[in-house]
Amino acid sequence: MSAATHSPMMQVASGNGDRDPLPPGWEIKIDPQTGWPFFVDHNSRTTTWNDPRVPSEGPKETPSSANGPSREGSRLPPAREGHPVYPQLRPGYIPIPVLHEGAENRQVHPFHVYPQPGMQRFRTEAAAAAPQRSQSPLRGMPETTQPDKQCGQVAAAAAAQPPASHGPERSQSPAASDCSSSSSSASLPSSGRSSLGSHQLPRGYISIPVIHEQNVTRPAAQPSFHQAQKTHYPAQQGEYQTHQPVYHKIQGDDWEPRPLRAASPFRSSVQGASSREGSPARSSTPLHSPSPIRVHTVVDRPQQPMTHRETAPVSQPENKPESKPGPVGPELPPGHIPIQVIRKEVDSKPVSQKPPPPSEKVEVKVPPAPVPCPPPSPGPSAVPSSPKSVATEERAAPSTAPAEATPPKPGEAEAPPKHPGVLKVEAILEKVQGLEQAVDNFEGKKTDKKYLMIEEYLTKELLALDSVDPEGRADVRQARRDGVRKVQTILEKLEQKAIDVPGQVQVYELQPSNLEADQPLQAIMEMGAVAADKGKKNAGNAEDPHTETQQPEATAAATSNPSSMTDTPGNPAAP
């Protein structure tokens, strides 16, 4: 690039060579975007449109011709002075005036006064001109910032002012010049760089980072970007050397908040999903997120809250923060926002207590209120649950898997002392046992609310099992493996039953068994409630308990949101 830039510069110099040679320390370069020559003063490390060979007023004219060299403007296509004209500028070059010299010396200060509003205005225009900006403005802006560290303020100010006064057009040429100057200076080894403001950007870095910025800058960073420019200037000098990274950092502030919503890859998956669906919720929880640092911290928490939030809509994620809420996030009904926030608190509890699932059970059961007490005691319930599961097996011979699963549960009940991971698995399997009974008792179609709820809870428990960290312990790993196998078997059985049994006739008969299992599982609670309420289903009582049970898992406090919950999972079951 440097060669190319230099040669054009030389040509320009010769072209302008009509005039005397440039003063020492000056260099002419051609703006690759506009084709206009601009001048680099290596002495002051600035660039200008004005020809130093013309009376020194030139630079001072700059303020008046902040948009373009006033003198040069005449020499160069007057269009430059007619800011709107800049036809030669690439569309993107709108925003950053490079009038570092004039701007820096005189205008910086005035501009600085305006810059903020100017920048905003400018930003807005830039946003409008985003397509144009995309090419150079980004480059211009990032580079301006880089070169402008010293001049950055000037550039920002100049940019702000021109945008304010002349709008993008003026900034365009300056931006272009800025870009070109920065690029050329970048291309010029140290001289160019130094001229630009001693940004020492690697030569290659000139325009690339800008592109990144454009994405962020246009939407998120525009307002903040000017702030970022000013705020980050000091850091930028060092940072800008690594152009792209700097931008990310700068936009880190701008960026981070955004990413929280959509940008961060994983977060976006987890929170992005939730952010999209529950962006309000997310914003509520992650309000901290705006600051990048906090964002990270929040991210951890938010994920947990998210899991819970999601849990409500998608019980699958499991209340365990570990469970992958990300996928579920999208499913979150907007209504869950409050839940999410509340969830956070709950989250911390579950997180701290590996047996949170039991607590969740309690919450779940609480809505039905049938057997909240049993869930609290996971150990005992686990033991009884195994016999119950056996009974279930007896009732439903097809459920051989339950029989297999049953033994592990007693063993796991003994295991609690072994390892928190085993305890977690045990607690999950307790729930699964209740769900298993519900499956055995289930009679209906796949569209029934009961079916959907059981399936959702089973999936949630599956995710919970996945989220258990074996920490390299074989016993935990084995317990988890067995639990996953069992849950999968139960899911298969449920599918078969739903297909095979269109009617819900047996539900009444099975009610007693459901009641028995209620203690171990919310699912059982649901089953019992369903069976009892089947007659009242028209009244919608069944929906309320079901939704409540789901919600408790997601958020016990989210009782207000049951309607949304019912809508999401419950509607299918409405039939």
Curated annotation (Swiss-Prot):
Residues with Omega-N-methylarginine modification: 139, 261
Ranges that cross the membrane: none
InterPro entries given in the database record: BAG_chaperone_regulator (IPR039773), BAG_dom_sf (IPR036533), BAG_domain (IPR003103), WW_dom (IPR001202), WW_dom_sf (IPR036020)
Biased composition (Low complexity): 155-198, 532-559
Residues joined by cross-link Glycyl lysine isopeptide (Lys-Gly) (interchain with G-Cter in SUMO1): 445
Cross-link (Glycyl lysine isopeptide (Lys-Gly) (interchain with G-Cter in SUMO2)) at residue(s): 445
Biased composition (Basic and acidic residues): 72-83, 250-259
Subcellular location, record wording: Nucleus; Cytoplasm
This protein's record includes keyword S-adenosyl-L-methionine: no
CDD domains for this protein: WW
UniProt entry keywords in alphabetical sequence: Acetylation, Apoptosis, Cardiomyopathy, Chaperone, Charcot-Marie-Tooth disease, Cytoplasm, Disease variant, Isopeptide bond, Methylation, Myofibrillar myopathy, Neurodegeneration, Neuropathy, Nucleus, Phosphoprotein, Repeat, Ubl conjugation
PROSITE patterns named among the record's database cross-references: BAG, WW_DOMAIN_1, WW_DOMAIN_2
Phosphoserine modification, residue list: 136, 173, 198, 269, 274-275, 279, 289, 291, 377, 385-386
GO molecular function, one term: dynein intermediate chain binding
Domain observations: The BAG domain interacts with the nucleotide-binding domain (NBD) of HSP70s and is essential for the nucleotide-exchange factor activity.
Its biological purpose: Co-chaperone and adapter protein that connects different classes of molecular chaperones including heat shock proteins 70 (HSP70s), e.g. HSPA1A/HSP70 or HSPA8/HSC70, and small heat shock proteins (sHSPs), e.g. HSPB8. Acts as a nucleotide-exchange factor (NEF) promoting the release of ADP from HSP70s, thereby triggering client protein release. Nucleotide release is mediated via BAG3 binding to the nucleotide-binding domain (NBD) of HSP70s, whereas client release is mediated via binding to the substrate-binding domain (SBD). Has anti-apoptotic activity.
Annotated disorder: Myopathy, myofibrillar, 6: A form of myofibrillar myopathy, a group of chronic neuromuscular disorders characterized at ultrastructural level by disintegration of the sarcomeric Z disk and myofibrils, and replacement of the normal myofibrillar markings by small dense granules, or larger hyaline masses, or amorphous material. MFM6 is characterized by early-onset of severe, progressive, diffuse muscle weakness associated with cardiomyopathy, severe respiratory insufficiency during adolescence, and a rigid spine in some patients.
The protein's assembly and partners: Forms a ternary complex with HSPA1A/HSP70 and HSPB8, serving as scaffold subunit. Component of the chaperone-assisted selective autophagy (CASA) complex consisting of BAG3, HSPA8/HSC70, HSPB8 and STUB1/CHIP. Binds to the ATPase domain of HSP70 chaperones. Interacts with BCL2. Interacts with phospholipase C-gamma proteins. Interacts with DNAJB1 and DNAJB6. Interacts (via BAG domain) with HSF1; this interaction occurs in normal and heat-shocked cells promoting HSF1 nucleocytoplasmic shuttling. Interacts with HSPA8/HSC70 (via NBD). Interacts with HSPA1A (via NBD) and HSPA1B (via NBD).
Name the UniProt record assigns to this protein: BAG family molecular chaperone regulator 3
Source organism per UniProt: Homo sapiens
